[in-house]
Amino acid sequence: ASTCGNMQLYSLIVTQDRALREALSPCHFNQPMVVEAPCLVTVCADVHRFTMWCEQRDADPAYDNFAWFLNAATDALLAAQNLAVEAEMHGLGICYLGTTLYTAERIAKILELPKGVVPLTTIVMGYPDESPELTDRLPLEAVVHYEKYTDYTAAEIDELWAEKEESELTRRLLAENGLDNLAKIFTRNRYRREDNLAISRSYFELLREKGFFNQ
């Protein structure tokens, strides 16, 4: 994968041991695939390894700050997506787990992450028993801008989400959640304000603990 300065500021922790996957399972809300799939990959931003190399060469590293967390996070997520694409090309199924950010402090303790290393996401990997339908996406014009950012009108927002909002899946979700539109499923049930703030505070504290907020 592309990497800042060819520094490879990431680590991929491959967990195949069942006991360790069972220990990590509560961090991912006990989703069955965490234990049932044969391989769990925790993707980490990592300035620790490069910092050690610099120090052992009498160089003065300065990567214990937020700018280099962002560089390391970019490196790590680029590597993660390349791993996911390569796995799928070889017939494996993958699933990203956003729960990593929810419980990053606990994951860091279980995986014994040193200073300068924080978890970003987790990929569950294995040979699938089924072939689920592809998840729908917004049309390309929703995410591609030419020359400059082009803001959206209210009518354009309606048009971009129309297919999602009219799908059978959305109708089923609205019935299950007792809500009148898809947006409220996200804001009231899936990603609530109070949860978002709690996760943010927890992750900022982990970044501070791991040395990414030094001035």
Map each language-model feature to its residues.
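Acidic, surface-exposed loops and disordered segments
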Residues: A1-Q215
